Structure formats: structure tokens, C-alpha cells
Swiss-Prot record:
Cell wall formation. Catalyzes the addition of glutamate to the nucleotide precursor UDP-N-acetylmuramoyl-L-alanine (UMA). GO terms for biological process: cell division; cell wall organization; peptidoglycan biosynthetic process; regulation of cell shape. It is found in: Cytoplasm. The lineage of its organism: Bacteria, Fusobacteriati, Fusobacteriota, Fusobacteriia, Fusobacteriales. The keyword Cell cycle applies. ATP binds at G98, T99, N100, G101, K102, S103, T104. It comes from Fusobacterium nucleatum subsp. nucleatum (strain ATCC 25586 / DSM 15643 / BCRC 10681 / CIP 101130 / JCM 8532 / KCTC 2640 / LMG 13131 / VPI 4355). SUPFAM superfamilies: MurCD N-terminal domain (SSF51984), MurD-like peptide ligases, catalytic domain (SSF53623), MurD-like peptide ligases, peptide-binding domain (SSF53244). This is UDP-N-acetylmuramoylalanine--D-glutamate ligase. It catalyses: UDP-N-acetyl-alpha-D-muramoyl-L-alanine + D-glutamate + ATP = UDP-N-acetyl-alpha-D-muramoyl-L-alanyl-D-glutamate + ADP + phosphate + H(+). It comes from the Bacteria. GO terms for molecular function: ATP binding; UDP-N-acetylmuramoylalanine-D-glutamate ligase activity.
Length: 432
């Protein structure tokens, strides 16, 4: 019997386990909290065909020992893709990565294709593994697949028909030796693409432009600011000379969503979707939860949940769309440069409530740029911050309360979804 080891029983690991067991593999599960520990697993490495590492697990001593023994390390994405090839599945993969905007783009491309009459779904770093989707959903025309840099580290055969990198900004410095290593890992999404396949290229992004020339796939350019295959001019989206839609008719608002929309339009044009169907969809598409989500009004006081903002660039977009708001910010310390965040807050934010283990560092950066002490409230967590606001604000307070943390949630929460859910529940409890 063929044998494989799975390290980490999260969404990816569970999906890979189910798929491989269906294919007759004996699976050894290693999970320091739920199954065999990594220390015990050292005695079970003989005879493995390969080793699957969950994306969130770093290259720790156990993984390095697996590497040292010459055992092939794969990700769940590679396992699932190989399964598709072996079974002769005709489903096409549209692969999406980027620092920000990838979840919205992934989900909305799937919705757009369904609206156009195809059978499509989404998978990947968006709550459902590719393996799970392949086992449960049959006869799909397309899978819109969100990929994090972690999921792209061990690509061998994976080859999407369309790939895209929405944008690249500093993130995950705790995982990679340098930002260059992080950026280059993102480009593994194009590694096996050939001239008959497509890469959608954001020519507004300097880091993408630096690396795009090495890509073999046909490049389709998008831009918010200059001429491209898909571009914005005079508040309209164009494909070459063809007017696709007025920007003010888009249901997804904000400069960040305009960028996401350009990738949707590029995908639609590559696949030759009916333009009227495309236009219809762009006028009714709804935003995802936890992404600049206005979810509650307490009289004039508005609450926006942007818990998905797990890096500085993402919070920048939220601040640009909600200037002069009161910001709740902070969380896990990812080791990134906080000076740009401090400048952004100084220029655009009325007051800031700092939470999480990174609060002191943000406060120090704010003081360096001259942000007034009386505008900084350091109250440890979301609940304390909201309780303080309840004492200060009434239904007549014409303010926007924006949760946009600029970092990960792992110091106090299980995920950004958990953080956003708790924020919404606390707002309703305290102000509802």
C-alpha cells in the first residue's frame, strides 16, 4: 500500500487526507494538537511516497529533517491538481494570488462565471480546499482558486489556464528571508504556464512589472491609471477601445475594488463572456464579509468591519475610503515596517484605538511622526475599545468607527474571520 504523511490537519490537510484515502493511500497524520506529534513522527518516515505540509506550518526542525532525508514535500494544491490530471478532469483552473484583494476577486470570478451560465465554484485559501471541491462537486467548468504564497512554495506540475497576481506588498516577513523571496514565491503561480495560457498583469504594480518579463504565458495587462488591455479612463472601464461599464455603476465601491474588478473584466474578456451578462453582474456583485463591510448604524454613528486587513497596504485602502474616521488597529506582530502606517494614520485618521501585542510598536511610530498623544487610546482589545466609545459617543455622533487592524489576528483570535465576527457581535451587544 502507498504511504504518505500529512503534517497539519487544517482545511488543506483534511482535504488531502480524504482525497488520498479515496485513492488507496495509507495516511499518517501528524498534528501536535490533534494526532501524532512531530517528535513521534520521526519514527514513521520510512517508505513515504511524499510528505504534505499544511500551508501555515513553517519550515521548522521537523520539516527540515524530512527534507534532509530526501522525502518529497508537496502542498495539497499539487496533490489535488495531480488528481485532476490523472482522472482526466476537464475543469479549468483560474488561479488568483496577491497581497490584497484575492479573496474578493476569487469569489466574484466564480459568481461571474455562474451568472454567465457556466458551472463554477471557488476553492483554496478561502475556506475550502481544492481536494474537498474535487471530491464533492462534479462536472465543474471552472474552479476559481485563491492561493497564498505558502500554498505556492512547493509547486511542481500545477498549471492554471489563467493566473493573476492582484498586487504585491510587504507581508509575511516572519516566514521569508526577504521581501524578494516572498514576491518570487508569488510568481510560482506562473511557473508551468505556457504560451497558450494567460497571465493577467497589473502594470500599476512595480514589483509585478519587474518580474513579469520572465513569464511564458500570454500577458493581458490591467491598469487603473494608464493605457492597458483593460484600463480606466474618464471614469469608464475599457477593453482596448470598447467601453465596458461606467465606474459609478459598479456595485463594488472603492479604489481597491476597482482593481479587483479590472481582473474580473480581464478574465471575462479572455473567456469571451457575453458583455451584457458581464455588465449585469458588475452592477449586482456584493462584497464579501469582513472587507470594508458597513454592517451597523447607531444613529449617525457608523461601524465598518475590515478585519480582513491583515497588512498595512490593506488598511491603507480602507483608510483612503474612510478618511477622518476613528480607527481600531493592531494585533499580532509580523515584524513589518510600521512607519508607513503611522504616516497614513497621521494624515487621515481622527483618533486611533490600539489593540494587541503590536500596540506599543504602533504607538512609538505614531509618536515619531508627531501624532498627538490625546488621539491615541491603548486599550488592549476590541471590547475595551468599544466600551470606551460607548461612554463617549451617542446616536448624534457623526463618526465612522473602522476596524482595520493592518496585521494578523493570532495574538487574540483564531483567524481574521473570528476577529471580525467578535467585533460585530460586540458592537451589537454594546450599541445595539
Amino acid at each position: 500500500m502507498k504511504k504518505a504523511m500529512i503534517y497539519g490537519l487544517g482545511i488543506s490537510g483534511t482535504g488531502a487526507k480524504e482525497l488520498l484515502e479515496k485513492e488507496g493511500y495509507k495516511i499518517i497524520v501528524v498534528d501536535d494538537k490533534k494526532a501524532m506529534t512531530s517528535e513521534e513522527a520521526l519514527n514513521h518516515l520510512e517508505g513515504l511516497e511524499f510528505f504534505i505540509k499544511s500551508p501555515g506550518i513553517p519550515y521548522n526542525d521537523f520539516v527540515k529533517e524530512v527534507q534532509k532525508r530526501g522525502i518529497k514535500i508537496l502542498d495539497e494544491i499539487e496533490i489535488a491538481y495531480n488528481y485532476m490530471i490523472e482522472k482526466g478532469l476537464k475543469t479549468k483552473i483560474i488561479a488568483i494570488t496577491g497581497t490584497n484583494g484575492k479573496s474578493t476577486t476569487t469569489a466574484k470570478i466564480s459568481d461571474m462565471l455562474n451568472h454567465a451560465g457556466y458551472k463554477a465554484t471557488y476553492a483554496g485559501n478561502i475556506g475550502r480546499s481544492l481536494s474537498e471541491v474535487l471530491l464533492k462537486e462534479k462536472d465543474l467548468d471552472f474552479i476559481s482558486l485563491e492561493l497564498s504564497s505558502f500554498q505556492l512554495e512547493n509547486i511542481e506540475n500545477f498549471k492554471p489556464c489563467i493566473s493573476m497576481i492582484i498586487n504585491i506588498g510587504p507581508d509575511h516577513i516572519e516566514r521569508y528571508k526577504s521581501f524578494d523571496e516572498y514576491y518570487n514565491t508569488k510568481f510560482n503561480i506562473t511557473k508551468n504556464q505556457t504560451e497558450d495560457l494567460y497571465f493577467i498583469e497589473n502594470i500599476d504594480d512595480e514589483e509585478i512589472e519587474k518580474r513579469a518579463k520572465q513569464i511564458k504565458a500570454k500577458r493581458i495587462s490591467v491598469s487603473k491609471f494608464k493605457k492597458a488591455d483593460i484600463f480606466v479612463e474618464n471614469d469608464k472601464i475599457y477593453h482596448d477601445k470598447d467601453d465596458i461599464i461606467d465606474v459609478d455603476k459598479l456595485s463594488l465601491k472603492g479604489i481597491h475594488n476597482l482593481e479587483n474588478t479590472l481582473f474580473m473584466v480581464a478574465t471575462a474578456e479572455i473567456l469571451k463572456l457575453d458583455r451584457e451578462k458581464l455588465k449585469e453582474f458588475l452592477m449586482i456583485a456584493t462584497p464579501l464579509e469582513h472587507r470594508t463591510e458597513l454592517f451597523f448604524n447607531y444613529g449617525k454613528l457608523k461601524f465598518i468591519n475590515d478585519s480582513k486587513a491583515t497588512n498595512v497596504d490593506s488598511t491603507k485602502f480602507a483608510i483612503q475610503a474612510n478618511k477622518n474616521s476613528i480607527l481600531i488597529c493592531g494585533g499580532y506582530d509580523k515584524g513589518v515596517d510600521l512607519a508607513p502606517l503611522a504616516e497614513m494614520i497621521k494624515e487621515n485618521i481622527k483618533e486611533v484605538y490600539l489593540i494587541g501585542v503590536i500596540a506599543d510598536k504602533i504607538e512609538n511610530e505614531l509618536k515619531k511622526v508627531g501624532y498627538e498623544d490625546n488621539k491615541i487610546h491603548k486599550l488592549v482589545n476590541i471590547e475595551n475599545s468599544l466600551q470606551d466609545m460607548r461612554k463617549r459617543f451617542t446616536k448624534d455622533s457623526d463618526e465612522v468607527i473602522l476596524l482595520s487592524p493592518a496585521t494578523s489576528s493570532y495574538d487574540q483570535f483564531n483567524s481574521f474571520e473570528h476577529r471580525g465576527k467578535v467585533f460585530k457581535e460586540l458592537v451589537l451587544k454594546i450599541f445595539g
